[in-house]
Amino acid sequence: MSDINATRVPAWLAECPCVGDDISHLLTRGEK
């Protein structure tokens, strides 16, 4: 699922920069 998330991150950041911050935190927790 890491690959899928990595691919979706750019799309989310491009559409919703504000949401991108929340996603970055979620991804950081998911990786750790």
From Swiss-Prot:
Record propeptide residues: 1-10, 18-32
InterPro entries: Amanitin/phalloidin (IPR027582)
GO MF entries: toxin activity
Post-translational modification: Processed by the macrocyclase-peptidase enzyme POPB to yield a toxic cyclic heptapeptide. POPB first removes 10 residues from the N-terminus. Conformational trapping of the remaining peptide forces the enzyme to release this intermediate rather than proceed to macrocyclization. The enzyme rebinds the remaining peptide in a different conformation and catalyzes macrocyclization of the N-terminal 7 residues.
Cross-link named Cyclopeptide (Ala-Pro), sites: 11-17
Keywords: Toxin
Record function comment: Probable toxin that belongs to the MSDIN-like toxin family responsible for a large number of food poisoning cases and deaths.
Homology family: Belongs to the MSDIN fungal toxin family.
Protein name per Swiss-Prot or TrEMBL: MSDIN-like toxin proprotein 2
Organism of derivation: Amanita rimosa
